[in-house]
From Swiss-Prot:
Cofactor binding note: Binds 1 [2Fe-2S] cluster. Binds 1 hybrid [4Fe-2O-2S] cluster.
Residue list for modification Cysteine persulfide: 408
Natural source organism: Shewanella baltica (strain OS185)
Lineage: Bacteria, Pseudomonadati, Pseudomonadota, Gammaproteobacteria, Alteromonadales
Broadest EC class assigned to this enzyme: oxidoreductase
Chief location bin: cytoplasm
Compartments it resides in: Cytoplasm
Protein name: Hydroxylamine reductase
GO molecular function: 2 iron, 2 sulfur cluster binding; hydroxylamine reductase activity; metal ion binding; peroxidase activity
Family: Belongs to the HCP family.
């Protein structure tokens, strides 16, 4: 086992990364090894997808499968060995299918079949024992003694960034958004990473290419969400419990939320969002469901307590899931899509009757809590609608600075930095937030500036796209570069989606971003120095010191 993809990975003087019997996330060594083998098989599929494309062969089914299966290897997504093995076996089937199509096309065209790298040649074992025996070939640091640590760090930066992009591709696909060119570029990068490179410049360029690719993917996801559900609008949301039977929907998949809402109409069940599903409450399409009553709980890391206290059924539509046995709710939590946990019921297809039956059998909330509301829904359209008023307030001096504070949440004590930063921002500044990092401060009162709320909840982590659009619009109005705006970006990172959002921002030329609370363990000190020199990227320090720098206070 070797896994170093998230913030909670083991860090010791002897080396970083989880490499024992179990990772800090709860992932067993066997699961980690099977995930590495799955990635290896997917890279082999991409090798042949690239070759097939050269002969004009595009398989949309395979284009959709590879990022979806890759998504299953993200932090806190799928812990079910049987499901991971099934993905690997499906990958082997698709690779053989593409290989046959490619070779037939070459024969018909009268050209030689090109040799493929080792990553596209492995004959996958048929049992768990056989697959685990093959896993060392796919170990991410298998050649760590032969290559420089900076090269290893760049490889992992690319791999983990592409994982984040794969997740967004799958979210977009669920909403009907696919693009053959995007899929083609994705396969090219997967294929490249399947042949471990020692070219630092090429790896760095690839990291920026992944950022650019993800910008296109985020635009696709934005289109999918707004076409399906309308543009988010400022919305007041209750964050307290409501009396009645209950279902809690966590993750990111709004299509699943829609299906659950449709299937619970008239059944006397209240539906609550959780975590990154909170932004769904701002979409017009969901406002026609009066039994979508609010948001319950906070960010992913608190789920073992929050789900244990929730008196209904819980559905995990995507990341992040953690051990449901700790809170003794494994019999009433259900997984969807790429999510998996051994022993937990997995919902295939679009029938949520098992979830509904479980909710009806449980007690539900026995009384209404006193409501506490927050305002959400400041995504792209709402931000653009507010832009003229924002510009006027900037020109008048009422608004002097913008902060984007968001990203992933986590349970480290030093994440209180983000709470204190938000509380310490000047009263003449606006705070944009997104991702589950918002839960560090989104229930606090920040007031407004001439009717414009100081705290603007942009949405899910992928809605960084909305924030980018606002920054571009403001830069055009003020006839300046984005980096010349009075804008400071402070991103909390935990896993691979945050990595690819960061790569997207860097690839767009956005500079002087702060990330925290701790730097990724796979980034060497030298790589961190290069990123700081090239982009001004730096780690958070103290709220007082960082604010002085961001506000140019001597």
């Amino acid at each position: 086992m070797f896994c170093i993809q998230c913030e909670q990975t083991i860090r010791t003087p002897a080396g970083n990364g989880c490499s024992y019997s179990q990772g800090m996330c709860g992932k067993l060594a066997a699961t980690s090894d099977l995930q590495d083998l799955l990635i290896y098989m997917l890279q082999g599929v991409s090798v042949y997808a690239v070759k097939a494309r050269e002969q004009g062969i595009i398989d949309a089914e395979i284009d959709s499968f590879v990022p979806k299966a890759f998504f299953s290897t993200l932090t806190n997504v799928n812990f079910d060995d049987e499901r991971i093995m099934a993905y690997a076996q499906q990958a082997a089937h698709y690779r053989a299918q593409l290989k046959a199509s490619y070779e037939a096309a070459c024969e018909q065209a009268g050209i030689a079949v090109e040799q493929v790298p080792q990553v596209a040649q492995l004959v996958l074992g048929t049992s768990k024992i056989e697959m685990l025996a093959q896993a060392p070939i796919a170990l991410l640091n298998k050649d760590k003694h032969d290559v420089h640590e900076d090269i290893m760090g760049l490889r992992l930066l690319c791999l983990y960034g592409l994982k984040g992009a794969a997740a967004y591709m799958e979210h977009a696909r669920v909403l009907g958004q696919t693009d053959a060119d995007v899929a083609g570029r994705f396969h090219e990068i997967m294929s490249f990473l399947g042949e471990p490179s020692v070219d630092g410049d090429k790896l760095f360029t690839t990291a920026m290419d992944i950022g650019q690719l993800n910008y296109r993917i985020m635009a696709m996801l934005d289109a999918g969400e707004t076409q399906a559900f309308g543009h988010p609008e400022p919305t007041v949301v209750n964050t307290k419990s409501v009396k009645g039977k209950a279902i809690l929907v966590s993750g990111h998949d709004m299509k699943d939320l829609e299906l659950i809402l449709e299937q619970t109409v008239g059944k006397g069940i209240n539906v609550f969002t959780h975590g990154e599903m909170l932004p769904a409450l701002a979409y017009p399409a969901f406002k026609k469901y009066p039994h979508l009553v609010g948001n319950y709980g906070s960010a992913w890391q608190n789920q073992q307590q929050e789900f244990a206290n929730f008196p209904g059924a819980v559905v995990m539509t995507s990341n992040c899931i953690i051990d449901p046995n700790v809170g003794s709710y494994s019999d009433r939590i259900f997984t969807r899509s790429i999510v998996g946990w051994p022993g937990v019921v997995h919902i295939e297809g679009d029938d949520f009757s098992a979830v509904i039956d479980k909710a009806l059998a449980l007690e539900g909330f026995i009384y209404d809590e006193i409501p506490h509301t927050i305002t959400i829904g400041f995504a792209r359209n709402a931000l653009m609608a507010a832009a003229p008023a924002v510009v006027e307030n900037v020109k008048s001096g009422a608004i002097k600075h913008f902060f984007l504070v968001g990203g992933c949440d986590g349970d480290k004590a030093d994440r209180s930095y983000f709470t204190e930063l938000a509380k310490s921002t000047p009263k003449d500044s606006l705070i944009l937030t997104l991702g589950c990092g918002k839960y560090k401060f989104n229930k606090l009162e920040f007031g407004d500036i001439n009717g414009i709320p100081r705290l603007l909840d942009v949405g899910q982590c992928n809605d960084a796209y909305s924030a980018i659009q606002l920054a571009i619009a403001l830069a055009e109005v003020f006839e300046c570069d984005i980096n010349e705006l009075p804008l400071s970006l402070v991103l909390s990172w935990f896993e691979q989606k945050a990595i690819v959002v960061l790569l997207t921002l860097l690839s767009l030329g956005v500079k002087n971003i702060r990330t925290g609370p701790t730097p990724p363990a796979f980034l060497t000190a030298n790589l961190a120095k290069i990123l700081e020199e090239k982009f001004g990227l730096r780690n958070t320090t103290t709220v007082e010191a960082d604010l002085k720098t961001m506000l140019n206070v001597a």
